Amino acid sequence: MSTKNAKPKKEAQRRPSRKAKVKATLGEFDLRDYRNVEVLKRFLSETGKILPRRRTGLSAKEQRILAKTIKRARILGLLPFTEKLVRK
């Protein structure tokens, strides 16, 4: 067997490093804390709807965490499902 026709070995490909996990915090507040009603109210509209990402400025992952937290607080009775209808 001759070594002239031997194919060169491929170098081992490195797997790209994973992105760091997003910490669901807003300053000193944890977005997963469903008992912190004052912080969660900042992300609700006047009628009680969850504000969209473009208004809150959160990442997609943080917005999903926030939505789960608000829904959990609503089920436990800490936040209302709806507010009074605001008429202008």
UniProtKB/Swiss-Prot annotation:
GO CC annotation: what is one? ribonucleoprotein complex
InterPro entries documented for this protein? Ribosomal_bS18, Ribosomal_bS18_CS, Ribosomal_bS18_sf
Q: Would the keyword rRNA-binding be found if you checked this record's keyword annotation?
A: yes
Q: Name one GO molecular function term.
A: small ribosomal subunit rRNA binding
Q: Does the keyword Membrane apply?
A: no
Please explain the role this protein plays, according to its UniProt record.
Answer: Located on the back of the platform of the 30S subunit where it stabilizes the close packing of several RNA helices of the 16S rRNA. Forms part of the Shine-Dalgarno cleft in the 70S ribosome, where it probably interacts with the Shine-Dalgarno helix.
Q: By what name is this protein known?
A: Small ribosomal subunit protein bS18
Which species is the source of this protein? Thermus thermophilus (strain ATCC 27634 / DSM 579 / HB8)
